[in-house]
Amino acid sequence: MFKKILVPTDGSPLATQAAMEGIELAKKIGAEVVCVYVAKENQNSEFEFSDGKPQSWPTAKEYEEAVNHAAEQFMQPLRESAEAGNVKFTSETFISNTTAGYIVYAAEKNGCDLIYMASRGYTGWENFFMGGVASKVLAASQIPVLVYKVKKEQVPKKAKTYISPRI
């Protein structure tokens, strides 16, 4: 059976729901959990103006701190759920525009033998059957992937829009 399960999250309600189910599976079979959050790279290609003056962009260090803070907020309920079930929980955060690649990389690096992920995250119903990240992970991974299919009625009607962490 599985000994170490990777559960990626993007902080969306759907990814969080899938991660919680992955933690429940780990609890039932006595596995560890590795939680991964991959944030988009800081995109400073466009200027935003306020009162006719360009707004300041975060430095690389500020952006990394903001990403780590956001990741901790996303992972805290997952960590608490794992700890309540006596499941060993570790986490990693990456900054990259290749989310699927880093999910697979983290699973391999941490010796995971299962990736348990949502069928979609913040992209919502953009890809009707399965989200783009889930599809790419399935295509790239040599490790088994369990895709948690969210039922249509479970999708929030007015989901919050995700915005990359900014200072």
Residue ranges with predicted function:
Residues 114-140, 154-156:
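Glycine-rich, Arg-bearing micro-motifs that act as flexible, cationic patches
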Residues 3-57, 81-85, 90, 153, ...:
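Small/aliphatic-rich secondary-structure junction motif
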Residues 18, 45-48, 101-104, 128, ...:
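Short, well-ordered secondary-structure micro-motifs
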Residues 80-115, 152-156, 161-167:
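Structural beta-alpha unit
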Residues 21, 67-78, 102-104:
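Short, solvent-exposed amphipathic alpha-helices that sit
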